């Protein structure tokens, strides 16, 4: 069995299918790990959702910020909707309710075999197992009766740092922001949400979340996406896979067993290495 971890798809369904074919993926024996942001900005979010859902247990996807945005507008309507999203086809689909219900069941974090898959990252003070427990708190709300209320309170940049005594919507918001939006943070874990450039553009006293010298999760390989300006980055304890397909760059897969890289350019297949 091979596991192929794939970066942010964001509705780039044609490139996604080309990449899956290039990998030689066999759904009867292999698995896809998808780092979230299945939807939005690209042209084929509906086809992407339908295909991933059809794979059943052969695909594991975590939730990204764009997936959560889809849930929000599905339940809250036009309030807070961005003018240039590409999600109307999903919202008008005959199987919309089934797809949205399925999306609500996806995990915020997946932990398996020394790997932790999460869309954006983990705060420097979090280790993998406790972080998984925090993710379950959010998952329980998303799949339960409080989902709509939570989605109404989910957006926001504060609090910017984790505290164990946080409660209610603030607690859940910090967990979601760390796992789906974070790029840079301070040594004490205060997140910065405006800076979206490459690592060398970090604001003063900020580092990429994975570069903190005392990162508590350094014994776990984090598989993530979200940061297209970072691009493909492979370190002993990091696989960052957002290589900017929706921006005209590449969609990337890495086979976990040997770290072989497979890539498809937006519009052209690149091959593997």
Swiss-Prot record:
InterPro entries: ApaH (IPR004617), Calcineurin-like_PHP_ApaH (IPR004843), Metallo-depent_PP-like (IPR029052). Keywords: Hydrolase. GO terms for molecular function: bis(5'-nucleosyl)-tetraphosphatase (symmetrical) activity. It catalyses: P(1),P(4)-bis(5'-adenosyl) tetraphosphate + H2O = 2 ADP + 2 H(+). Pfam families: Metallophos (PF00149). CDD domains: MPP_ApaH. Its EC number is 3.6.1.41. Hydrolyzes diadenosine 5',5'''-P1,P4-tetraphosphate to yield ADP. Belongs to the Ap4A hydrolase family. HAMAP family: ApaH (MF_00199). This is Bis(5'-nucleosyl)-tetraphosphatase, symmetrical. It comes from Aromatoleum aromaticum (strain DSM 19018 / LMG 30748 / EbN1). The lineage of its organism: Bacteria, Pseudomonadati, Pseudomonadota, Betaproteobacteria, Rhodocyclales. The gene is apaH.
């Amino acid at each position: 069995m091979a596991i192929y971890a794939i970066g942010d798809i964001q509705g780039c369904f044609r490139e996604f299918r080309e990449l899956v074919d290039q990998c030689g993926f066999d759904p009867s024996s292999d698995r896809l790990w998808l780092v979230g942001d299945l939807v939005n900005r690209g042209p084929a979010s509906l086809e992407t959702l339908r295909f991933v859902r059809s794979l059943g247990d052969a695909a594991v996807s975590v939730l990204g910020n764009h997936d959560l945005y889809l849930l929000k507008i599905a339940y809250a309507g036009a309030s807070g909707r961005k003018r240039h999203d590409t999600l109307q086809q999903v919202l008008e689909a005959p199987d919309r309710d089934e797809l949205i219900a399925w999306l609500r069941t996806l995990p915020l974090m997946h932990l398996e075999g020394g790997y932790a898959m999460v869309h954006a990252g983990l705060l420097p003070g979090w280790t993998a197992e406790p972080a998984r427990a925090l993710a379950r708190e959010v998952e329980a709300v998303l799949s339960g009766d409080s989902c709509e209320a939570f989605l109404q309170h989910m957006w926001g940049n504060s609090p910017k740092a984790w505290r164990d005594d946080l409660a209610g919507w603030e607690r859940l918001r910090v967990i979601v922001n760390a796992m789906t939006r974070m790029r840079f943070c301070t040594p004490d874990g205060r997140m910065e949400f405006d800076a979206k450039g490459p690592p060398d553009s970090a604001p003063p006293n900020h580092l990429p979340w994975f570069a903190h010298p005392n990162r508590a999760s350094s014994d776990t390989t984090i598989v993530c996406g979200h940061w297209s300006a970072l691009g493909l980055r492979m370190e002993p304890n990091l696989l960052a896979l957002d290589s900017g397909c929706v921006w005209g760059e590449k969609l990337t897969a890495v086979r976990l067993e040997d770290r072989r890289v497979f890539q498809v350019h937006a519009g052209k297949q690149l091959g593997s290495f």
